[in-house]
Regions:
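Bacterial N-terminal signal peptides that target proteins for export
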Residues: 1-2
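Small disulfide-bonded, cysteine-rich extracellular recognition modules and tandem repeats
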Residues: 15, 50, 72, 151-154
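Contiguous, well-ordered beta-strand patches that form the walls/edges
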Residues: 53-55, 78-128
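Short, solvent-exposed loop/hinge segments that bridge or flank secondary-structure elements
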Residues: 30-82, 141
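Beta-sheet ligand-binding and adhesion/scaffold domains
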Residues: 17-34, 103-155
Length: 155
């Protein structure tokens, strides 16, 4: 009898009784996906890469990143409109998405809500220098602020 009562109560709660509005779909709690203010084609290309922990080291790190252009990190164009990059601690790059957020921040990461643990936040981007930081605290500590300096003018 208790199982029958539980089943009936479960059914009633999904029907929206005593309400003039229909019940929300199960995933309605997720915020709608927002587009990033940076387009994938803006970051595709060859980049010198270095990182820093101390903000005072940023100018020196940009110079070091530029020096890495002889062995550039390549951000590729994905087949589904994203970019091909590495996730933290992954040897194989994969297609990631650029995602916007209600707070105005941009992220790069796998499909899912912006600012998820596997994402990296785009701290700044001016077309020539891209700075990212992993959302995951452990990855952020290990990798620091990643500085990408464009190696050559875009085609």
């Amino acid at each position: 009898m208790i199982s029958t009562l539980a089943a009936l109560l479960g059914a009633c709660s999904g029907m929206g009784l005593m309400s003039s509005t229909p019940s929300a779909p199960p995933d309605a709690g997720m915020a709608p996906e927002m587009p990033a203010t940076i387009r994938p084609d803006e970051i595709v290309g060859k980049w010198g890469l270095a990182s820093y922990q101390n903000p005072a080291d940023r100018p020196r790190t940009e110079v070091q990143a530029k020096a890495q252009c002889k062995q550039p990190y390549v951000i590729g164009a994905g087949t589904s409109g994203g970019v091909v990059m590495h996730l933290a601690d992954q040897a194989t790059p994969e297609e990631l998405r650029l995602k916007g957020s209600q707070g105005g921040k941009n992220y790069i990461g796998p499909p899912g809500p912006a600012g998820s643990e596997q994402d990296r936040e785009i701290v700044s981007f001016d077309g020539r220098v891209l700075i990212t930081r992993f959302v995951d605290k452990d990855a952020a500590t290990r990798y620091g602020n990643m500085v990408y300096v464009r190696c050559a003018p875009r085609a």
